[in-house]
């Protein structure tokens, strides 16, 4: 059963056609990796899945993006509700630096009106455990989130994202600023999170895509200034070992990109 489905998706920034005719399905409780050279549109597609690209003036989408069969761009759909259901973890960890670790985790819940202190504490612990961070921070929950290491901050942001109980988690190069040990911790976490969430990750690290994902989507573009496009989508093992498209094979083998 597909959790997400993109039908003939075209993305524009004003007059610029950024991404052309993307069709893909994302199965529930799986990890899908988006790979491809810089400028190919993979992060643009990712951000369109929870309407984050709309914060840029002039950006718009043609086609359908379906979550459980419902178009998230439908006329009666609230973008804020979409972002609660489809969470996002960014490339650079972005905790609220002066806010306590606990308050960082429950910031989204508080914003949506939750005031029950007992529930907030329970959700904070549950989410920190879910992000494999609880044991490292349980004795300093009142300390600022900005005081954590880079890897811990990224896991704190993941805890904050899952605290509002999304159904889908989008990750835009979540390990690009992390050291190898912290990267491994986040990758292990991704494997655990897919038991509960549907995950889509953009990564420039081909080995990471091979390690963490169930299926891989390879994006490319004909030339600078041309729209990005989805070249090939398939099971990760097949994409990396026996792709159907020569362009995919050339990228995977390092002959371009």
Swiss-Prot record:
Residues 4-252 form the ABC transporter domain. The keyword Oxidoreductase does not apply. It is a peripheral membrane protein. The keyword Acyltransferase does not apply. ATP binds at residues 36-43. It comes from the Bacteria. Keywords: ATP-binding, Cell membrane, Membrane, Nucleotide-binding, Phosphate transport, Translocase, Transport. It is found in: Cell membrane. Signal peptide: none annotated. One of its GO terms (molecular function) is ATPase-coupled phosphate ion transmembrane transporter activity. GO terms for cellular component: plasma membrane. One of its GO terms (biological process) is phosphate ion transmembrane transport. Coiled coil: none annotated. Its EC number is 7.3.2.1. Its main location: membrane. It is an enzyme of class 7 (translocase). Pfam families: ABC_tran. It catalyses: phosphate(out) + ATP + H2O = ADP + 2 phosphate(in) + H(+). Part of the ABC transporter complex PstSACB involved in phosphate import. Responsible for energy coupling to the transport system. The complex is composed of two ATP-binding proteins (PstB), two transmembrane proteins (PstC and PstA) and a solute-binding protein (PstS). Belongs to the ABC transporter superfamily. Phosphate importer (TC 3.A.1.7) family. PANTHER family: ABC TRANSPORTER I FAMILY MEMBER 17. This is Phosphate import ATP-binding protein PstB.
